[in-house]
Amino acid sequence: MSKDDLIQFTGTVLELLPNATFRVKLENDYVIIAHTSGRMRKNRIRILLGDKVTVEMTPYDLTKGRVIHRH
């Protein structure tokens, strides 16, 4: 699977979970579990409750995603 197959959504962080994982409500009212991308961990970018984030998801599992950008 290439990067072209990934789907991007914008959402809001609802809940902070352990291990850099978050419950995110997407703009289409779905709630998913998302983890922080490696570059965000490496650069120590903090994500707080209520932050607007961009989430990248695979079309095979629409319940999990990866946070790639904080707005």
Curated annotation (Swiss-Prot):
Coiled-coil annotated residue ranges, if any: none
Top-level taxon in the UniProt lineage: Bacteria
Alphabetized Gene3D superfamilies for the sequence: Nucleic acid-binding proteins
Subunit-structure text: Component of the 30S ribosomal translation pre-initiation complex which assembles on the 30S ribosome in the order IF-2 and IF-3, IF-1 and N-formylmethionyl-tRNA(fMet); mRNA recruitment can occur at any time during PIC assembly.
InterPro entries assigned: NA-bd_OB-fold, RNA-binding_domain_S1_IF1, TIF_IF1
Protein species of origin: Rickettsia felis (strain ATCC VR-1525 / URRWXCal2) (Rickettsia azadi)
GO annotation, cellular component aspect: cytosol
This protein's UniProt keywords: Cytoplasm, Initiation factor, Protein biosynthesis, RNA-binding, rRNA-binding
Family: Belongs to the IF-1 family.
Cellular compartment(s): Cytoplasm
Residues spanning the membrane: none
GO MF annotation list: ribosome binding; rRNA binding; translation initiation factor activity
Protein name: Translation initiation factor IF-1
Boundaries of every S1-like domain copy: 1-71
Gene that specifies this protein: infA
